[in-house]
Amino acid sequence: MGVKAAQTGIWASQGQSIRVVGFQAQTAHRAICLLGFVVLVLLQCCSAYKLVCYYTSWSQYREGDGSCFPDAIDRFLCTHIIYSFANISNDHIDTWEWNDVTLYGMLNTLKNRNPNLKTLLSVGGWNFGSQRFSNIASNTQSRRTFIKSVPPFLRTHGFDGLDLAWLYPGQRDKQHFTTLIKEMRAEFIKEAQPGKKQLLLSAAVSAGKVTIDSSYDIAKISQHLDFISIMTYDFHGAWRGTTGHHSPLFRGQEDASPDRFSNTDYAVGYMLRLEAPASKLVMGIPTFGRSFTLASSETGVGAPISGPGIPGRFTKEAGTLAYYEICDFLRGATVHRILGQQVPYATKGNQWVGYDDQESVKSKVQYLKERQLAGAMVWALDLDDFQGSFCGQDLRFPLTNAIKDALAAT
């Protein structure tokens, strides 16, 4: 009976005493948990910087440990999470994957315990193509139909805004892209008038000078966007015929035109010169690397290649490795740092991969702070070590966490 009293706290005076103590302990525990939750929320919401993180729906199809669903995401890791991608069907925003609605729910459930988290839905992407966007944006009725379809779709599925991923507007689309953004913003303002919180509007833009010049009126689109994610990666690929880092912070000593434009520093500076407000510019940091197959015994930057690198075990795309695949590659590899560009690369056999690590992302965050930018963008959460089982640190999302910590550092 004494044991039962101790367990239930309702029979004997001794049991009642135990019940009170248990209640006090539970109350204290809950208070500590609540305090920890409040601290995490305050740390996130009160940071001066955005950490905008993309999640790709097709990552669910990767085999085994490479498969990633939205419920694997740390709800306190990013300030904004962008779901990629939505489709456009008959001039209306629409789902792309067969289970998008389920995944939308998984993602937006993260906000239940972090009300400061913002989620956006990105429309477009590489597979969508530029021509379909062009057809919609250039036709007044199609554009209007698309714009009107967006707010109810976002509200229905619990998103806080829209991200435009038109890759890329052509020269003739430049004005149409500006008009699309301006009219979308006007619709968001109008839709919010009944007392709803206004939907956010962002865009992902190229970091290449030629594309920037032909595709965007930066000064005008900046007026109507909450933030602009500049994709400061993929500066270098197998099409160059030589090795090179795809996301260098600075120009390399050996770089000549057009390579002198192919770095983060130039792209950011150029955007600022084109009147993109620093307070709206979010700088891209990749959680993937670009790999090459060497054509000779040369292994340095600028070495000849025979083509892209061997596909990764999970991503299965020649020339691309997720950070967690790179961690596997580094076992037995030789690591080098390109000091002037402040990024690493690694070689093993005839394989060469340029990537970002925790040291290089910290350098990039320090740079964006010095430029007084709005924050960092990550492509993509599912390419980081999201399980914490590949990179030997017992830490989930090591690159994204390094970015977050660097943003929070004083």
Swiss-Prot record:
UniProt: chitin binding residues: 97-98, 124-127, 168, 231-234, 290, 379
Main location class: secreted
Region Important for AKT1 activation and IL8 production, residue ranges: 351-365
Species: Pongo abelii (Sumatran orangutan)
GO CC aspect terms: cytoplasm; endoplasmic reticulum; extracellular space; perinuclear region of cytoplasm
Descriptive protein name: Chitinase-3-like protein 1
Record-level GO BP terms: activation of NF-kappaB-inducing kinase activity; apoptotic process; carbohydrate metabolic process; cellular response to tumor necrosis factor; chitin catabolic process; inflammatory response; lung development; positive regulation of angiogenesis
Residue span, GH18 domain: 49-410
Cited function: Carbohydrate-binding lectin with a preference for chitin. Has no chitinase activity. May play a role in tissue remodeling and in the capacity of cells to respond to and cope with changes in their environment. Plays a role in T-helper cell type 2 (Th2) inflammatory response and IL-13-induced inflammation, regulating allergen sensitization, inflammatory cell apoptosis, dendritic cell accumulation and M2 macrophage differentiation. Facilitates invasion of pathogenic enteric bacteria into colonic mucosa and lymphoid organs.
Keyword Cell membrane attributed: no
Region forming the signal peptide: 1-48
SMART domains: Glyco_18 (SM00636)
Disulfide bridge partners, by residue number: 53-78, 327-391
PANTHER family with a match to the protein in the record: CHITINASE, CHITINASE-3-LIKE PROTEIN 1
